[in-house]
Amino acid sequence: ALDLTTADLLPEFKALADDLDPGLRLTMDGQDSYGIPYNVEGYGYIVDKEMIAALVGEDNVDSFIEKYKTATYDEFADFVEKVNAYIKDGKGNDFALSGQTFSLLAEKNEKAEKLEGVFSVAGSEKWTYGDHLINIPIDSVFPNVAAAVNATDEQLDKLYNPMVAYAKTLDLITSHAVSERGPEFINSTTNGYDAAVANFANGKTLFIKQGNWCYTNIKNANSEIVDTLTILPIKMPFEQGDIAVDGLTVEHMNSSIPVFCGNYYVLNKQVSQHELEEAQKFLVWLNTSEEGQHYVTEEMAF
């Protein structure tokens, strides 16, 4: 692979490569850079705003989303319990987010009646909680990939409390999922990715923990809801003492969504100079032209 920081590049491509956010670089030591992002992914709790309206009323949707973003983990956990009880017995209860009180509607409408669980979880898909969700506690100790790759024993020891917070969060999600925990929960035939997406898209759950890559799957399952979807931050019960990254706070971690790059365009340094130049021109066009950006954001749904 060609190191974009030292190679002789076309000026337009060099500008594109140099403009990459350091956190999105394909790097092993924090200095080199070997790729241009294929896409940028972000994940959290995907929710249909119309389902929020079915729970707290249409007039309260915007304030719910605003207050949710800055709510604590304890407030979120209480909200999950209240919604779970609402699904099971239909009793409306009050809950607070960022100190503001909301009330679950006394009578369920048709949309709320369809709810069977708070979360849709693809239990058989280990990447959803083993590759993605677990990155949140890792981010509390390591500022970037290079730091994690070169971790010391002392840094690894600092992961203990963040991992406990992760386990509590995972327990909250799976214990309030539409699929019951047990052997069937990790059965790929009955509780895989497609089944989880279908449960959410068809209104059986309030949340699904996924990212923007899920858009096309949700659209294929139920195109009527894609225009009213949003992504909310994942909450974890961190203490400030658990955070080892300078300048990072519990409030920031619980009010923002993780953004990362999982795939890259990499230039093969073994090919001809002509092929290298054509590849650079293509990537410049794809990432800077109006037509190229249209394909990335609209056709590829990134």
Where are these regions (language model features)?
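Extracytoplasmic/periplasmic solute-binding protein
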Residues: 25-39, 43-45, 74-151
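Glycine-centered hinge/linker elements that transmit conformational signals in sensory
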Residues: 77-80, 144-190
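A local structural motif
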Residues: 60-67, 171-191, 204, 224-228
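Glycine-rich, aromatic-lined ligand/substrate-binding cores of catalytic
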Residues: 170-175, 195-218
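Short helices/loops that flank or line small-molecule/ion binding pockets
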Residues: 1, 52, 75-87, 108-110, ...
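Extracytoplasmic/periplasmic substrate-recognition and gating elements
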Residues: 31, 222-301
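Extracytoplasmic "Venus flytrap"/periplasmic binding protein-like
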Residues: 1-19, 50-55, 59-62, 206-207, ...
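Hinge/lid segment of periplasmic solute-binding proteins
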Residues: 1-44, 100-114, 232, 240-250
